Design a protein with these regions (language model features):
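Conserved alpha/beta core of the MobA/IspD/sugar-nucleotide pyrophosphorylase nucleotidyltransferase superfamily
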Residues: 1, 146-187
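Nucleotide and nucleotide-moiety/phosphate-recognizing core
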Residues: 1-130, 135, 143, 162-169
Length: 187
């Protein structure tokens, strides 16, 4: 079993309103991430909520939610909340961000297929202009639990490049929507 963890707890401070609820193609950003996970052959999808949790949860379908009461302490706390909520039988987790609505089921499937074939500790998409979502084997979750503050698994990737298998994707990184100008470029 592989779990999808959608990080959707952030305050959207640079954007000024809850990004997770912004719509693209008549669907909230957070639902795009859930659909990519579910359609990408992940058996379990967990959305980690924090800021504006009730409104984000109301906009969701097809995912289990977990509340991160420490979301203001940074992304690492949401990642840990997602890992803690994962099924004990889960052998890996694909981590998706709620503000990247152009990540697709095909992207998720590429991570899963690479993991199933080579059993790498970390599998990460490498777009033409930078890194994308990653799959974290359960074997590295204890290392992930050491993270603090507003950081994700990038610190572990930087510290242990030998653990990482990168899957080349011949496209630009799907836009991470942080500011209003990003939203206009996305549409």
């Amino acid at each position: 079993m592989i779990t999808g963890i959608v990080l959707a707890a952030g305050t959207s401070s640079r954007f000024g309103r809850t990004k997770q609820l912004l719509e693209l193609d008549h669907k909230p950003f957070v639902q795009h991430a859930v659909d990519a996970a579910a359609d990408g052959s992940l058996e379990e999808v967990i959305v980690v909520l924090g800021h504006d949790a009730a409104a984000v949860e109301k906009a969701l379908r097809g995912a289990r939610t977990v509340l991160n009461p420490a979301f203001a302490e940074g992304q690492s706390t949401s990642l840990l909340a997602g890992l803690d909520a994962a099924d004990p039988e889960s052998e890996a987790a694909v981590v998706l961000l709620a503000d990247q609505p152009r990540i697709t089921a095909d992207h998720v499937r590429a991570l899963v297929e690479a993991f199933r074939v080579r059993r790498s500790l970390i599998v990460r998409l490498r777009f033409r202009d930078g890194p994308g979502p990653a799959l974290l084997s359960r074997d590295v979750w204890e290392e992930v639990r050491k993270l603090t503050g507003d950081t994700g698994a990038r610190e572990i990737v930087a510290a242990h490049p030998e653990w990482v298998e990168e899957i080349a994707v011949d496209e630009e990184v799907p836009l991470d929507v942080d500011e209003a100008t990003d939203l206009h470029r996305l549409r």
